[in-house]
Design a protein with these regions (language model features):
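Bacterial N-terminal signal peptides that target proteins for export
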Residues: 1-10
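N-terminal signal peptide c-region/cleavage motif recognized by signal peptidases
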Residues: 18-19
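Interaction/scaffold regions that mediate signaling and macromolecular assembly across diverse proteins
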Residues: 26-80, 84-89, 98-274
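Cleavable N-terminal signal peptides
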Residues: 11-12, 22
Length: 274
């Protein structure tokens, strides 16, 4: 009887410690969550968001403090986390440093009227290739986070990340109005996917033609790597017939490879609240 009770107590203690550790790891994103909850606004019937960069600039210290928290995470600490914690961390890092890139250049002498994140690049390099991010023991670029740590690591194989990372442009999937966290990551990624695919200004089926975002052209390979047994872009799309408003006939055509796929122009205008 005593031994049984002791085992129950030990199991309860382990669960409590595990829960506390999980909450502590997710709590690092609290300040980011607070910042974007207050300064990211849903538009376009909830399909998109607009960012009040000017307001965030007024609270720049809060943003930089959060970035310092991310910088303090060591590679060994990161490696010890479960995959959802890692991926939530990397998505938040990408989004927060993108906002930092915009805010630090907003209304500056060099960019008094910033129109697009692409204005922050040059003829020789893009803004995404700039190495300005101290993360996991190295100075990295936004490209490093997305293409090496997330896509290139082989750890995650989840194409839905393309609807979570935000490039500060109108054509991008919405910057989510809350931080990504391990415990909610699956639901958050799923909601972001539906949110983007159901936006008829960026993805729409008419007759035998499916017009979709250029994201699917640039990163098409990511949708052909077996995520949830989908090995083609069409198979991935068929996971979301309701979001895409596909008729039964269109679903059959897509399944049989009979739908024409058209990639829409991308809007690189800054996703700023006006």
């Amino acid at each position: 009887m005593f031994k049984s009770s002791l085992n129950v107590l030990l199991c309860s203690a382990i669960l409590l410690v595990t829960s506390f550790a999980s909450n502590a790891q997710d709590s690092m994103h609290n300040s980011w969550n607070d910042l974007i909850t207050k300064n990211v606004l849903a538009i376009n019937n909830g399909h998109s968001t607009a960012v009040d960069y000017a307001a965030i600039k007024q609270q720049h210290g809060k943003l930089t403090s959060y970035l310092d928290v991310l910088t303090a995470v060591s590679q060994s600490t990161f490696d010890a986390w479960e995959k959802p914690k890692q991926l939530a961390f990397l998505i938040n890092a990408y989004n927060a440093w993108t906002v930092e890139l915009i805010v630090s250049n907003l209304a500056s002498d060099k960019h008094p009227d910033l129109k697009s994140i692409k204005d922050l690049g040059s003829f020789f390099s893009s803004p995404w290739s700039k190495a300005f991010i101290p993360l996991l023991g190295k100075t990295r670029s936004l490209d490093d986070i997305e293409h090496k740590l997330i896509r290139g690591s082989g750890r995650y194989n989840d194409p839905r990340i393309h609807f979570a990372v935000n490039c500060a442009s109108i054509g991008c999937p919405a910057l989510r109005e809350e931080a990504y966290t391990a415990d909610k990551l699956e639901a958050q990624l799923q909601e972001q996917t539906v949110r983007f695919l159901s936006d008829t200004t960026r993805n729409i089926a008419k007759g035998d033609t499916l017009s979709i975002s250029s994201i699917f052209k640039w990163y098409g390979d990511d949708f052909e790597k077996g995520f949830r047994d989908t090995n083609t872009l069409g198979e991935f799309m068929l996971q979301y017939p309701k979001a895409l408003k596909l008729t039964l006939e269109q679903q059959t055509m897509l399944k049989n490879g009979e739908m024409n796929i058209k990639f829409l122009d991308y809007n690189w205008e800054l996703n700023a609240h006006r």
